[in-house]
């Protein structure tokens, strides 16, 4: 990753210390993100295979997930998706249920 890339990573995606200083390099972010996402695999061998493969893919920048994933993976209640699609029924009850669902998603 080049100098400009390092600056972008530090400013936008790295975890910060109490003073707002970046505490991660690109390699650290990759390990944090892949470590978090790989927990979806229940089987430890599958998890290890995914971790190894995905780490290589991300380090080579063949695939880089979206910003919410880079920023929030590994944090408590970290939201990894950028958007959600919910059906909104055409009634007051349905609209209010939708508002409640949206609030729960974003809490």
Spans of model-derived segments:
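Extended catalytic cores of very large enzyme megasubunits
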Residues: 1-107
């Amino acid at each position: 990753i080049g100098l400009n890339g390092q600056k972008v990573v530090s400013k936008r995606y790295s975890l910060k210390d109490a003073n707002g200083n970046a505490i991660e390099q690109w390699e650290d972010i990759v390990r944090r993100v892949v470590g978090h996402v790989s927990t979806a695999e229940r089987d430890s061998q599958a998890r290890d295979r995914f971790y190894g493969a995905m780490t290589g893919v991300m380090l080579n920048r063949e695939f880089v997930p979206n910003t919410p994933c880079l920023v929030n993976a590994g944090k408590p209640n970290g939201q990894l998706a950028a958007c959600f699609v919910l059906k909104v029924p055409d009634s007051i009850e349905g609209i209010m249920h939708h508002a409640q669902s949206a609030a729960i998603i974003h809490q």
